[in-house]
Amino acid sequence: MTQTQPVETIPQPRHAPVAVPTAGQPYEYRRRPLVEPDWTRFPGWRHVTREQWENAQWQRVNCVKNIKQLRTVLGDLVDETFYADLEADQKALATMSMLVPPQMMNTMVPFAPMTTEAFLADPIRRYMIPVASDRRTDWPSHPYASRDSLHEHDMWVAEGLTHRYPTKVLAELLSTCPQYCGHCTRMDLVGNSTPAVDKLKLTLKPVDRYDAHITYLKAHPGVR
C-alpha cells in the first residue's frame, strides 16, 4: 500500500548501502519505501483530499484527456512553449489520443521543482504525453516499420485473437485502455483515431467476438 505525505515533509532519498553483487547478479538494486508524491503541488489538484485521491472513481473521472484539461492541472507551472509543442504533436504526429490518470500524472517530476525544462526532461512525461520536439522527424523510419509493429492483426485467427506461439494466444477484448501511452505498440487498434492514424475498428459485438475466441480455443487444446 502506498503512503502519501505533504510535499514539504517528504524526506530526501537515502541511498542504500553498497552491496557486493552475488554470483550471477551484476546489478545493485536500491530498495526504498514507495512514497506517493504530493499531488497538491499541481494547481488543479491543490484542494483534492486524500479520500478523493485514493478513490478509483475519482481517478477515472479526472483523467487528463486534452490540452485544456492539462492546462487546468498544471496551471502556470509550465510555459506556453510546452503547450504549443504539444498542440503541434497532437495535430500532426500523435498516434494516440491523450488519456492520463491523475496517479500517472503525479509520477512526473515527483520530488523536484516543476518547471518547463523539468517537465520536458521527465521520462514518464515523454512516454505518456509526447510533444513534437521529442520526435526525430529528420530520421527515416525502419524500412520494415509498420503501424502494427508486432503484426498481430496479420495473425488474427478470429477478430481480436492472435495466435503466434504454439501454446499462447493474445486476446484483445477491448479497444480501450485505462491510460493511453504515447508510444503504444498496439496503437493501430487501441484508442481513438488521430490526425496521423485512422485506427482499426472491432466490428463484431463483444458477445460474438468472445464466442469466436472460445470456439477457436476449444478446437486448439494445445493452447494453455
Regions found by a protein language model. Name each.
Residues 129, 137-172, 182-224:
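Conserved Radical SAM active-site core
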Residues 176, 180:
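The −1 position to Zn-ligating cysteines in a subset of zinc-ribbon hairpins
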Residues 2-164:
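Flexible, acidic/Gly-rich N-terminal and inter-domain linker regions that tether
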